[in-house]
Every structure is written in structure tokens, then in C-alpha cells.
Regions:
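Ribonuclease/tRNase effector modules and their secretory precursors
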Residues: 1-98
Length: 98
């Protein structure tokens, strides 16, 4: 059975206000094949239960921490933020071609 996505509606409003993007934009990018990486959160000590999506959206790469709720079969998205280093790492060849 496939997992669905969930997120805080309040957090989504804040992100839409501050970043002009929301969780639905991230979910659409993932479902459209723009998931670049899925791994454990790099800071396992501080965030032992979190995972991290690396997602391409428009001209940037966003980091999306999430937790897995196996009981509800949900991936709960915590937040998302653009990451300059990830953008350079994953999109460097595309930028050189332009």
C-alpha cells in the first residue's frame, strides 16, 4: 500500500506567505519525477526519526524533512527550504549548459 502525504495547514499558510510556495507544490514536484534523493536526515542525533527529500522545483533544489507515520501510512512533511549547496550539486550541469 502506498503512503500518502500530510502536512500542517498552518505551516503551509506561513510558507506560502514567506516563500510563495506551499506543500502542494513540493508534492506535485515529487509526483512529477523531480525527487532527486531520499535519505535519512543528516543530523541523526537531533532528528533521529526524520528523513529528507531532496526535490527539484523550478530553478532550485529544496530540502524537505519529513517523518514516517506507519500506523496511518503517511509521510508527514515538516517544512521545506531552498538549499544553495544542493542546487549547485544537483543542477550544476544544467546551469553550465545555459
Amino acid at each position: 500500500m502506498k503512503y500518502s502525504f500530510d502536512y500542517s495547514k498552518e505551516k503551509d499558510l506561513v510558507l506560502r506567505e514567506t516563500r510563495k510556495l506551499g506543500f502542494e507544490d513540493i508534492i506535485n514536484a515529487i509526483e512529477s519525477g523531480n525527487l532527486l534523493k531520499n535519505s535519512r536526515h543528516p543530523n541523526k542525533t537531533k532528528y533521529p526519526n526524520q528523513w529528507m527529500f531532496v526535490v527539484r522545483l523550478k530553478e532550485h533544489v529544496y530540502l524537505v524533512p519529513y517523518v514516517i507515520d506507519n500506523e496511518r501510512r503517511v509521510l508527514f512533511l515538516k517544512t521545506f527550504y531552498p538549499n544553495r549547496k544542493a542546487t549547485e550539486k544537483y543542477l550544476k550541469n544544467e546551469k553550465k549548459e545555459k
